[in-house]
Amino acid sequence: MSFPDEETDLLSEAKHCIRNVIHRTHRKFLENRLIGNFDSEDFSDAWKKKFAHAPTWCDADMSLQQIKRGKAVGNTVALTARAFFQLWLFRIGCFVQRWAWSTIFISLFLYCLCLGGLRHVTIETDLVKLWVSEGGRLNEEMGYLGQVKFERESGHLVHKVKRAVEQTTEPPAPAVKAEVRRGPELPKENGLGGGFQVVIQTPSFDGQNILSKEALQQHTKLMEEISTYEVKMFNETWTLSDICFKPPGPSFNSGPLAGIMSKLLDKIIPCIWITPIDCYWDGAKPLGPNPPLNLGPEVASFVSSLPPGNVTWKNLNPTSVIKEVGTLFDLGPIGNFFERAGIDGAYLDRPCIDPLEEECPKSAPNYFDRCHALTKFNEWNMAKAMSEQVTLERKIIPKDDGKSDIAETILNDIFGKKRRKRQADTTTKKPATKKDEDYYEYEDDADYLAGIANSTIAKKNPEKEAKDLLCLEYGSSLLKWMQENPERLGEFLTKEEMPDYPNYGDVMTGGCKGFGKKIMEWPEDLIIGGIQRDNGKLVSAEALQSVFLVSGAYDVFARIKNDKTDSHPGLDRHHFQPWMAGEIISTWQRNFTKRLYSHELNRERRQFHPLASTSIADMLEEFSQFNYIIIVIGYILMVIYAAFTQGRFQGWWLAVQSNVALAICGVILVTISSICGLGFATHLGINFNAATTQVVPFLSLGLGIDDMFLLLHNYDEIINICNKNEIGVLLKETGMSVMLTSINNILAFISGYVLPIPALRSFCSQTAILLAFNLIFLMFIFPAMIGIDLRRQRKGKRDLAYCSRGNPQMATSQSVPSNVSNMSSRAELAGYEKQADEYKRHEPWYTVGGFLNKIYIPALKNNVVKACVLIGTTTAVVFGLYGMYTSTLGLELADVLPEHTPPAAFLRAREQYFSFYPMFAVLRGDKLDIPNQQQLIEEYRAQLGSSKFMIKAEGKLQPYWMSMLRVWLQSLDMALEKDLAAGKFDLTNGNPIKVNGEKPSPESMIAARLVCSFGTNYNCDGRLGKMKMVENEVINPEGFYNYLTGWFNVDNMMYYVSQASFYPTPPGWEYNEKLAKVVPAAEPLLYSQMPFYQNDLIDTPAIVKMIEEIRATCEEYSERGLSNHPSGIAFTFWEQYLTLRWNLFQAICIIALAVFCVISILMFNPWAATLIMCIVVITTIELGGFMGLMGIKMNPISAVTLICAVGIGVEFTAHVELAFLTALGTIDQRLESCLQHMFVPVYHGAISTFLGVVMLVFSEFDFVVTYFFYTMTLLVALGVFNGLCVLPVILTLVGPKPELTPTDGSSVLPPPPPLRQQYAEKSGGVEGGMRKRKEKRPAEVEMSARDSPSTSSASHSSDDESSPAHK
């Protein structure tokens, strides 16, 4: 009995059948859904011949059929994937061919929906927003203060105070009239204007020494002109004095002259100028005030130190005035302030640029005595004959007009109140005691003035008066004559009497000082450029730089809103808003730059280079607009080239086979596609910038047209070898290459997003979006247009002459339903028999095709040529590596502006002459404990100052807020110690005590109030006389924030000068003798800054080295608990260079990996992807090296070009590689096949890319020409050489094997027989197998089924033989 064996055999056969069913079901799904089952019966003999040489290129599905039939072996996984892509590309092509017009209209309608975004286009012109890295520490640091303000004001920030603060039951005394104070908006320097308005003066001719009388006078005159520039807005006239940054006047004690002095100082406190003319008395000229103050003789009569007539900084000695007024009235600690600030005689003790200047004061070191000179001149002149005598012009001396308006106001303020007080006082009693406020005891004002006059006026000397009058009348005329005739001065003056012109180099060595000599020190490198020295002294210079500061909008608003002098009567103060102040500032700045651009000294050669915060933004906005003329010219050139390459002539007009109309429409629709892409990008919130408007239109056109030429090239061939579903076949064969290059280009620009520069991210994003839109156009709209053109050609109509017929030489096209499937071939194409003849082009040797076939391909097959190519490539790579090694970092700020514009000229002058940059060290955060970290802060500042890039004035760093606070407190400690020794204070409560009728000094009274204040407590017992506010150079931590409040309010001018920029600002407070209350403690500081000046930052490597050094120090002290960061233009615009190389390496790795993965997925051949990557890497190295050798510096813009080179390089290699991979035959045959297939479209694509790029040469921006035109042109040249020359040579040596190899070893593979024949073969094979199975034993049947490949293959596909007829 054999039943167990039979059961086992049956069970095994059942399992085998189940496996076969599952396998067949799986294969059926793949073939039905993923593979097209294309039928060779549908194609012409010419197409079959093409298939025989490149089967997998033409039809991967038919290649799989041959593998199944055992006619070939190959990578079935790759071919299955290829067949899937080709099936869907074929279906897309068939669909757009059938519904061509509908596809075009619907696609264009959807595209046009994106145009709505163009209504909201924003061109970003803020260079800081364009350049500062997004998401990095720099971005966080720049936004820190704004974020802290927002959090604090919205209540989200809970500040952890490190010292115990107890809530007092009794609120402190109201400070300054219960006013909520806001800190000043200190000007921010970003190197591009900001609050710092800059003027650079350069020589009028080459070799001029600008340290000369004439040049310095020109600079002085310009400063005076700037101070008078005005604009009219809001019914008022505004000048620089209305908007400039000026410190507030110092505080005065309450008294009869306190308010008056405050008003006077508010009018006379000047704008802060940083200028080289501050070395001279002439520096006072632009300070004003304008118009001058005329206090009249009444005021001058009792303040003899005031100059008679008009009062300006040219004749004002503020220290003398304060001292004299201080003997009459109690002015508080103002004298102490003047001494610490070093105001002294202001400008009156400085030399005059020209001692013959009429207004040069007598106190000037080189004052010229015109009266003595006039006497000598008259003696000399009178000795001459009448005909030779010099006639001087007499000056009319005006009579005094009496009291001025301001004098009347002052006198009324002083005396009016007293008169009213006396009139109201009706008592006959004599006051028992005289109060301190009663400084006079005259019956009326005239008696008071007469008393002062009698005590100061001496007896008159008639002879001296006559001499002085003569000098007044003719002195000015004499000085003018002497200036015009310097060669004749020796005729009446001795050598000792000659005018004493200063040695300008000696005077300006070491820099200059403002009106506050101790607090306003302008380093030499800030104000003088192109310096030459001799023994440390300046001997010549080539440039002068002046800076004046403009306040923030809110400060100007507050100043005007609270102005009690009613200086702008036409302004509606009730409706005045901060934005209006901002408009005034920006309008004045634009007027300032406009006036200097057109200055008379800038006509022949630009000497004055201005820059305001609006300058660069305005210039970028103007030149960032689309240049439609250049764009139109560029697109016309592209149309002409496309039409030229696609034109075919027959007789007098274009032939039927010509594609000029397609080329023109393609260029136009690529343009429309790009415009719609920009609209879509705007919908996504991507702003435009100069790179967008100047580069993207041309770059997207050049890259978008490449694949259009590939489609047109294959279209010429397809219509001559196919008569059915031509567009489907076109996309099936060409669509893979189009997708391969387009996707890699898109990925390349997406990878550029790794660079954190906003402008470059916008550029890369917009370009990627435009390329994606172009890809959709190439896959849908353009094939539909080709389908329409195909109908023309089938009808025999000439190109661009549809009423004229030509010789079509082709059969009429037929089409299949759009739902072509794997089952459609035989039934739907039954009856189709007509085949097209094989098509060959006529290509003379001078055409691209003729050169290729007759010269180029034979040359590449020569081993000597191959060796030369490889040696040349190796050499280029070596030079490339050397060039990359020697390349330097850098992008000059002037390069990002149009070359011929004034802002660019300013930046070039600055780069040439001034390597000076300001910076701030910022202390920040709620974890700071400044009172107890004073020593750490000093160490931090000292270590920063030890950098070789830091400027030290006379070996010392720039003073900062804590050092100024410490000096102020030390001066108060000294005053308090002196008055305590004199017994002028009650030690228990701090109240002042008169000793011999004298009260304590104002400084000591403020000091006593501060010593008794600590936190929220006020207690003098045990503190007065026993402790100081500053001990061993350390401020007492217990009362630190109380002292800070006192300094901020009493010494507020010093606060402004310190540029501390406190946040939160201390509360308001003023000294009140009658209210002994605590000085309110300031809140712990969340933000403060200390200024530094840096020099020798001549280029990007030096700046990067400085940043690394400063950053290292900042990070060290942050780790030690002192949260801080640096700030300034150098950090703003060069910070990204610290990570540029890493970001570039990262981006190139990302795009390289992406390209490798895309090629590997689409080709399913890692070795082919590796070879492409090798060529792309070679191209990138060569490009980077040549950029270095050409002097193109490495920066974020050139980094984008290198990143994109990886993706764009695929454009020139992927086509050739794919054609080589799909070709059959020997190495040389495959080389010839791939070049014949791809050389012409790649060449035309390169030319079209170059035509798109070449229009960049007309850009106004240097960086566009340098970093896009030069590099992109070089990239195209390298890409063509490496793609069409180096890659083919490498492929002949180490190229991948063909995807398919005929089993018979031949170099051709004919297409498979028609599907109906294959079905018949399979059916016959199955029936024969079944008959044999019945004759065999079960074991033999099982063995036969497993061992026979052909039988197995036939049986596996037996279920697939359900032909449409069966169904």
UniProtKB/Swiss-Prot annotation:
One of its GO terms (cellular component) is apical plasma membrane. Residues 1346-1356 have a biased composition (Low complexity). Keywords: Cell junction, Cell membrane, Glycoprotein, Membrane, Transmembrane, Transmembrane helix. Residues 1302-1367 are annotated as: Disordered. This is Protein patched homolog 3. Regulates osmosis during embryonic development. Required for larval development and in particular is involved in larval molting. One of its GO terms (molecular function) is hedgehog receptor activity. It is found in: Apical cell membrane; Cell junction, Adherens junction. Glycans are attached at N235, N310, N454, N591. It is a multi-pass membrane protein. Gene3D superfamilies: Multidrug efflux transporter AcrB transmembrane domain. Residues 119-625, 681-694, 759-767, 885-1143, 1193-1199, 1259-1273 are extracellular. One of its GO terms (biological process) is negative regulation of smoothened signaling pathway. Belongs to the patched family. The chain crosses the membrane at residues 98-118, 626-646, 660-680, 695-715, 738-758, 768-788, 864-884, 1144-1164, 1172-1192, 1200-1220, 1238-1258, 1274-1294. It comes from the Eukaryota. Residues 627-788 form the SSD domain. Residues 1-97, 647-659, 716-737, 789-863, 1165-1171, 1221-1237, 1295-1367 are cytoplasmic. In males, expressed in the precursor and mature sensory rays, the cloaca, and pre-anal ganglia and cephalic neurons. Also expressed in five cells in the valve region between the seminal vesicle and vas deferens of the somatic gonad. It comes from Caenorhabditis elegans. PROSITE patterns: SSD. SUPFAM superfamilies: Multidrug efflux transporter AcrB transmembrane domain. InterPro entries: HMGCR/SNAP/NPC1-like_SSD, SSD. Disruption phenotype: Embryonic lethal with embryos displaying a fluid-filled appearance and dying at hatching. RNAi-mediated knockdown results in high levels of embryonic and larval lethality. Dead and dying mutants do not respond to touch, display extensive vacuolation, molting defects which include unshed cuticles and in particular male specific molting defects that prevent unfurling of the mature tail rays. Surviving mutants are shorter in length and display defective egg-laying and abnormal vulval morphogenesis.
